[in-house]
Amino acid sequence: MDIAIHHPWIRRPFFPFHSPSRLFDQFFGEHLLESDLFSTSTSLSPFYLRPPSFFRAPSWIDTGLSEMRMEKDRLSVNLDVKHFSPEELKVKVLGDVIEVHGKHEERQDEHGFISREFHRKYRIPADVDPLTITSSLSSDGVLTVNGPRKQASGPERTIPITREEKPAVTAAPKK
């Protein structure tokens, strides 16, 4: 009976847990890190799993992310759109939804040719008037969509509590 001996420093291409790179961890159109090109000694282990991409470098954390915040006085949506020019972006309100769409046709960059397109939708809360929503694009490529929240009608007032002499719950009649 022959027994196959596998050395831990030799990669086995069909080992079920082998995952030298994950397709969904890639940031297409972004620069490569040295760790993307060269294997480390730990990645040679058949049990090595590449850490999620958000552990890679601080500059990757804010790439392509969006954030929706409800602040005390306004709705605020921030979206990283640094790969798009203002002419390639559209922001519109349809009913109670903010739609952001970005698209640019194929163009050449330092790695080859790339085209991008995205759609994002955000539900507008009931206390934000859709007609008051505005958007702006910063110099570093962050699209901000704002909408002021409606103020509560009237000033705050304290409601006094009165005491009644009869109970709120009475016993059910006996049969």
From Swiss-Prot:
Q: Where in the cell is it found?
A: Cytoplasm; Nucleus; Secreted; Lysosome
- Residue span of region Disordered: 142-175
Q: Which GO terms describe its biological process?
A: negative regulation of apoptotic process; negative regulation of DNA-templated transcription; protein refolding; response to heat
Q: Does the keyword Acetylation apply?
A: yes
| GO CC term, one of those recorded | protein-containing complex
List modified residues, type N6-acetyllysine: 92, 166
Chain sites annotated for binding Zn(2+) 1: 83, 111, 119
Sites where a glycan is attached: 41, 170
Going by the UniProt record, its keywords in alphabetical order are: Acetylation, Chaperone, Cytoplasm, Eye lens protein, Glycoprotein, Lysosome, Metal-binding, Methylation, Nucleus, Phosphoprotein, Secreted, Zinc
**Chief location bin:** cytoplasm
Modified residues annotated as Phosphoserine in this record: 19, 45, 59
Q: Where does the entry say this protein is expressed, by tissue? A: Lens as well as other tissues.
Q: Which Pfam families match?
A: Crystallin, HSP20
Highest taxon, organism lineage: Eukaryota
Q: Which PROSITE patterns match?
A: SHSP
Subunit structure as annotated in this protein's UniProt entry:
Heteromer composed of three CRYAA and one CRYAB subunits. Aggregates with homologous proteins, including the small heat shock protein HSPB1, to form large heteromeric complexes. Inter-subunit bridging via zinc ions enhances stability, which is crucial as there is no protein turn over in the lens. Interacts with HSPBAP1 and TTN/titin. Interacts with TMEM109; in the cellular response to DNA damage. Interacts with DES; binds rapidly during early stages of DES filament assembly and a reduced binding seen in the later stages. Interacts with ATP6V1A and with MTOR, forming a ternary complex.
Q: What is the stated purpose of this protein?
A: May contribute to the transparency and refractive index of the lens. Has chaperone-like activity, preventing aggregation of various proteins under a wide range of stress conditions. In lens epithelial cells, stabilizes the ATP6V1A protein, preventing its degradation by the proteasome.
The identity of this protein, by name, is Alpha-crystallin B chain
State the species of origin.
Spalax judaei (Judean Mountains blind mole rat)
Which gene codes for it?
CRYAB
